[in-house]
């Protein structure tokens, strides 16, 4: 069987991802099947397995595509790092997380949380470490703890029919949390706070440029 052309490969991949989100409109994540995906995408099972190992692989890829298309990683990372002028948690949910909010509502919080933590760890590694180096265990503990809290806030806002949270109160909490985070990470990793902030600003610029491409 001939390999699909690049344009056909991209088209089938996108159709399967769109079909995943369409199925999620009516079903919980654990109830979605490959048959339902291929039927919605009007593709066969062979095409599915050419692109993805299983539903978990498709879910992870769908989340990654959504992160890139909605510039979600810069937004979430800005929240965690307390970057000046960053979007609020409420704005992030309301403006950029419609599909991921649906995933949370359909029982996918654990899957989404795992993907967010992986991407955030990668970003902090790029900021704090030279090539070939790794984050120290103490730094990883701090990042894991803080990221879990931010994800909890996002999930809480997602599950509210209409948010009653005061943006000022939430912003104040996040600012306090960010100051603590930068101090603790700097101490654990041995990087001065001003250097961390400089690298965060540089990373934000690169992330936003990539998101616009």
What residue ranges belong to the model's regions?
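Short Lys/Arg-rich basic patches
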Residues: 1-6
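Short, hydrophobic secondary-structure boundary micro-motifs
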Residues: 32-33, 101-103, 112
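An amphipathic alpha-helix adjacent to DNA-recognition modules
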Residues: 10-21, 25, 30-34, 39-42, ...
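C-terminal peripheral helix-coil segments that are non-catalytic and often amphipathic
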Residues: 156-213
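Amphipathic alpha-helical segments that line or abut small-molecule/effector binding pockets
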Residues: 79-101, 144, 152, 171
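Secondary-structure edge/capping motif, primarily at the C-terminal ends of alpha-helices
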Residues: 74, 100-103, 127-131, 157-161
């Amino acid at each position: 069987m001939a390999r699909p052309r690049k344009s056909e490969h991209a088209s089938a991949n996108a159709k399967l991802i769109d079909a995943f989100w369409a199925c999620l409109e009516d079903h919980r994540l654990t109830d979605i099947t490959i048959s339902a995906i291929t039927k919605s995408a009007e593709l066969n099972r062979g095409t599915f397995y050419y692109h993805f190992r299983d539903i978990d692989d498709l879910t992870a890829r769908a989340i990654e595509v959504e992160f890139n298309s909605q510039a979600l990683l810069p937004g979430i990372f800005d929240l965690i790092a307390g970057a000046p002028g960053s979007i609020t948690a409420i704005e992030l949910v309301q403006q950029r997380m419609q599909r991921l909010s649906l995933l949370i509502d359909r029982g996918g919080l654990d899957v989404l949380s795992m993907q967010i933590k992986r991407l955030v760890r990668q970003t902090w590694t790029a900021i704090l470490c030279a090539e070939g180096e790794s984050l120290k265990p103490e730094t990883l503990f701090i990042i894991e703890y803080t990221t879990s809290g931010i994800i909890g806030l996002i999930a809480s806002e997602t599950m509210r029919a209409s948010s009653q949270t005061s943006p000022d109160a939430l912003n104040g909490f996040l600012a306090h949390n960010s100051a603590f985070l930068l101090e603790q990470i700097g101490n654990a990793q041995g990087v001065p706070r001003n250097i961390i902030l400089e690298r965060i600003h540089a990373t934000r610029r690169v992330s936003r440029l990539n998101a616009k491409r």
